Amino acid sequence: MEQSILDLLRAGGFILYVRHGEAIVGEDQPYFNFQYCYTQRNLSDYGRREAVYYGQMLRYWQIPINSPIIASPLCRTIETAQLAFPTMYIQIDPFWFEINKLGGDISAREQQQILKNVQSQLEKTPPFGTNQVIIAHSFPNGIGLGKIPNMGTVIVKPKGEGNGYEIVKQLPLTDLATLGNSLYK
């Protein structure tokens, strides 16, 4: 039986893993500091508008969101969370910065450990009737949740701790406007 993604999200029980809004061109400084945004790539003006729109769409569709919103400690993810969810508490979780390491030169063992930790985070079921939002970073192609566009969302269905998770759908930001027409089989 087909159900709309919107109906599923309104019922709750999902993790919405979201990549931050568009950032300025360039790279984080080699020895950046989480406390100093000027050492990092930050949101562009367009990225700020994307974040505001994202939050507006979730409120428009009346998708229940659990508080706190979880964000990586980089300024671009924190600002994305603040703009999308201005009235909600934001919890900074340093673990989600680890996703950035997956695209770098790390050992297979370190990569496996990061992915194992991602799995354990994505297995956690949110409180009944709500969805958990995590705002972090894209993964490299073919690793973890894969490449995610700016403000793209991977809808994850946790199966409980130790039982894995299912990727329900990946939605680019533009698909939020037509969420009621998107089906899950």
Predicted regions: what is each one?
Residues A108-E123, L179-K185:
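A polyampholytic, Gly/Pro-enriched intrinsically disordered region
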